[in-house]
Amino acid sequence: MTTHELQQEILRLKKEKNVCILAHAYQSQAVLEVADYTGDSYGLSVQAAKTDAAGVIMCGVRFMAETCKILSPEKTVWLANQMAGCPMAEQLDLPALRALKAQYPGYATVAYINTTSALKTECDVCVTSSSAVNICRALDADKILFIPDPNLGSYVAAQLPEKQFAFYHGGCPRHMVVSAADVARARAAHPAAELLVHPECRAEVVAQADYVGSTTGIMAYAKKSAAREFIIGTENSIVEHLSFDCPDKSFYPLAVQLTCMNMKLTTLPDIYRCLLGTGGEQITLPADIMAGAGRCIRRMVELGG
């Protein structure tokens, strides 16, 4: 089948089987075109909870599918490609977290949503990149242990000087490697462009940005801005999607290394096989993890998503 024929068959099957397809913004344009909803990890899970579909296919990475299952326990949830994991989410395990918490008694533990469900069972609340500042501000705690990304944690801490922060030294392997030198090169090549950066980037990069925000925030800003050129400091799929959505504007990658191969694992054939029942992985979680991680995620929703 051609790409178009495969897309049409996927659209037919998802309707026939009453399945909702969710695609993270870092997926390919071809995958986004068959999705019912696109966005960031938390936004997709919220949409999954709202849909009337009996089943959900997550085109993203494992922690996203797990979050979706926790927020929609009555639905059947599949991860389209079972090999798609998030390196940052897998950097810290439970024994290491417990040891870290022992070093910081009296600290509230705040987990980035990019963590495993097992890890969330030991945390007080989780956050997204767009909600981290507001939730940490609202949290009834003066001391916060922020895991696993010190870049996002430092960005939050800089805006909340009244609170004391400690960090685990993990982070996104892609965003972490971008440097001030990359910014200098991109600015020199595109002097009229605005720089839009994800807070998973290092502080030396964030400090030079015209806008700092989540994937969804970056896309919304670029679409509304009067500027005509943008340097995109997050996963390079966003350059592709913004170029598709805003053909009258120009978008440039901040650095070629901002490509997440884990997010590129999911393909149209994966989704097709999932709908046929011959591929993908149905997500199941033990009852204690569903309950513990659910408490952590629900508190995030209560404090403002």
Q: Where in the sequence are the language-model features?
A:
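Active-site loop-to-helix "anion-binding N-cap" substructures in soluble metabolic enzymes
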Residues: 1-232, 238-305
